Amino acid sequence: MGKNLRDLLLAFKNGDISLDEIEKQIKLNYYEEIEERLKLDINRQFRTGVPEVVYGKGKDIDEIIKATLKLVEKNGIALATKIEDIEKLSDEIRKWNLKNYDIKINKKAKTLIIKNKNYEVKKIGKVGILTAGTSDIPVAEEAKDTLEIMGVEAITAYDVGIAGIHRLFPALKRMIEEDVCCIIVVAGMEGALPSVIASMVDIPVIGVPTSTSYGIKITPLLTMLHSCSPGIAVVNIDNGFGAGVFAGLIAKIMHK
């Protein structure tokens, strides 16, 4: 596994590399280029606390695997999201020699996680994830995988929307018992569930509108933005990744 910026600084501190060598390596570490088409920001995690992630939409399978492996080489673990042909990726990745890696393909979320077997993700807290319906689960799973690479445990409860609100209370009780630092709430249709949750808890709620609804797909987004319950942040439609990042950063701050 290659060295990231933190590893280089520790090596310099311990006297393992010279000043000239660390200067050279830092310059080389600004980004990694793959066949002039992909430029990976490999030190994003050091700057922002959030690792570079491969956005799979519009990329072919070979590009996705190469880019993800390059990030793993530098950071130990990497995620690819919005993979359009997840079945093809599942078939193609078997042809690669990846015996030194743990591979997780989430067909529902259309994500790929590759981790070096020698890399251990530092655990930094817990986040709750709720969905209104089963149709919202793919977006919730994308958020869950994002949290996983950030070292955050996801406590999940799916299909607990307001059409059968009695289903919600045991799930919410468990979230409180698990001491989650915030709750991601994924909902389509009219998008009311985040407002209900925010009226019951004293922690941040992150609303994720989904496109799984009748009529105009923007409806749940507008509902969440116009909520009368304070304490809700809202990401864009189907943006499980963005919700996972936001929640992961909250967990990171709480862990300090």
Curated annotation (Swiss-Prot):
Bilayer disposition of the protein: Multi-pass membrane protein
Stored InterPro entries: P2CMN_synthase_LarB (IPR039476), PurE_dom (IPR000031)
Subcellular location(s) of the protein: Cell membrane
The name this protein goes by in its record: Uncharacterized protein MJ0165
Organism: Methanocaldococcus jannaschii (strain ATCC 43067 / DSM 2661 / JAL-1 / JCM 10045 / NBRC 100440)
GO BP, sorted A to Z: 'de novo' IMP biosynthetic process
GO terms, molecular function: hydrolase activity
UniProt KW keywords: Cell membrane, Membrane, Transmembrane, Transmembrane helix
Bilayer-crossing regions: 181-201, 231-251
Pfam families attached to this UniProt entry: AIRC
A single cellular component GO annotation: plasma membrane
Keyword Cell membrane: yes
Lineage, top ranks: Archaea, Methanobacteriati, Methanobacteriota, Methanomada group, Methanococci
Keyword Lipid metabolism: no
SUPFAM superfamilies xref list: N5-CAIR mutase (phosphoribosylaminoimidazole carboxylase, PurE)
Domain of life: Archaea
